[in-house]
Swiss-Prot record:
One of its GO terms (molecular function) is rRNA (pseudouridine-N3-)-methyltransferase activity. Its EC number is 2.1.1.177. Keywords: Cytoplasm, Methyltransferase, rRNA processing, S-adenosyl-L-methionine, Transferase. S-adenosyl-L-methionine binds at residues 76, 108, 127-132. The lineage of its organism: Bacteria, Bacillati, Bacillota, Bacilli, Lactobacillales. Disulfide bonds: none annotated. It comes from the Bacteria. Its main location: cytoplasm. The keyword Glycosyltransferase does not apply. GO terms for cellular component: cytoplasm. This is Ribosomal RNA large subunit methyltransferase H.
Length: 159
């Protein structure tokens, strides 16, 4: 199985980089993990709705260019489905049963995701109604991916 994270924006904080690196190292025994960071578009302080839409579209097109036809795409969006960790673990494992060997997770930038990215996604997923920095969301997501594998292994990590 190959897992790809397509994210908008450069990760700057060392503590987040260190946490993500640790979980990526742990995941190596289960799957190949690839992190793709796309440059975010500069957003003016008082951007108009039209400017925001144009920025979303540019970022969305960059994201779509990194998604292959045969990947199962899970886009993180506030309106998406919420899952307990056990259900998320089962969902990840079920994708292989349905003929997908690659799962791509998408995390948008500060403006969210362009509608075409949401449309391309096989699943919209949410970690709740809270607003989190998209950089922090990377760490939360990769930990949950690791937890999903630990649940499948019957590991006490999940307790």
């Amino acid at each position: 199985m190959k897992i790809k994270l397509v994210t908008v924006g450069k990760l700057k904080e060392k503590y987040l980089k260190d946490g993500i690196a640790e979980y990526m190292k742990r995941l190596n025994r289960f799957c190949k993990v690839e992190m793709i960071e796309l440059a975010n578009e500069k957003t003016p302080d008082k951007a108009s709705d039209l400017e925001n839409q144009q920025i979303l579209e540019k970022e969305g097109n960059k994201i779509l260019a990194k998604i292959n036809e045969r990947e199962f795409v899970i886009a993180l969006a506030i309106e998406g489905n919420q899952f307990p960790s056990e259900k998320f673990s089962q969902l990840m494992m079920d994708t292989t049963v349905h003929g997908f060997s690659d799962i791509t997770f998408v995390i948008g930038g500060s403006l969210g995701l362009y509608p075409a990215v949401k449309k391309r996604a096989n699943l919209l997923m949410s970690f709740g109604k809270l607003t989190l920095p998209h950089q922090l969301m990377r760490l939360v997501l990769i930990e949950q991916i690791y937890r999903a594998f630990m649940i499948q292994q019957g590991s006490p990590y999940h307790k």
